[in-house]
Design a protein with these regions (language model features):
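C-terminal cap/substrate-recognition subdomain and adjoining C-terminal extension
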Residues: 36, 40-41, 47-168
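A metal-dependent, Asp-based hydrolase signature
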Residues: 1-60, 64
């Protein structure tokens, strides 16, 4: 059969319009800053604080999928910078996250790469990866705690709500 993909995600309990605007506003504050500075700040933040936030169940779930031979991707509304660290920690081979435009001098333009990896935008990135892997989303699992991920939950064949927000 087609390869299955396990997707793990965290973050965000606010409504789509509010969080999309917040993400874009946050990215704009980076205008002109070197991407290399962000890479270093996020690495430090991950090591000092964020790494400890990973729930043990996340690692166990990912390990089960890896042992079954599944492709594992981290699908997150976080930035690719932070998401990449979590993906590496979990052993995920793909990171689907918000990306920021960088100019030819290595500085942020203040614009996100669209669509944002949030709400319906997550479906876009999940479908694109599934297509690249020759997989069908109906063969994929997706783990989330957020109501904002309902569009992805509705598209995958194996949706899993983990410590769900009350709206799930």
């Amino acid at each position: 059969g087609a390869a299955r993909a396990a997707y793990w995600t965290f973050l965000y309990e606010l409504g789509f319009a509010r969080i999309e605007r917040a993400i874009e506003d946050g990215i704009r504050t980076l205008t002109g800053q070197p991407e290399s500075d962000m890479v270093e700040r996020v690495r430090s933040f991950f090591e000092e604080e964020a790494r400890a936030l990973l729930r043990p169940g996340a690692e166990r779930a990912v390990q089960r999928h890896l042992q079954a031979g599944d492709q594992v991707a981290l699908l997150t509304s976080s930035s690719c910078y932070l998401g990449g660290h979590f993906a590496d920690l979990l052993g995920a081979s793909h990171t689907l996250a918000n990306r920021f435009e960088v100019d030819d001098r290595g500085r942020f333009t203040g614009e996100p790469v669209k669509p944002l990896c949030y709400g319906p935008g997550k479906v876009h990135y999940a479908q694109r990866l599934a297509d690249e892997l020759g997989a069908d989303l109906s063969d994929c699992a997706f783990y989330t705690d957020s109501y904002a991920d309902v569009p992805v939950l509705e598209r995958v064949g194996h949706p899993v709500a983990v410590h769900p927000d009350p709206r799930l």
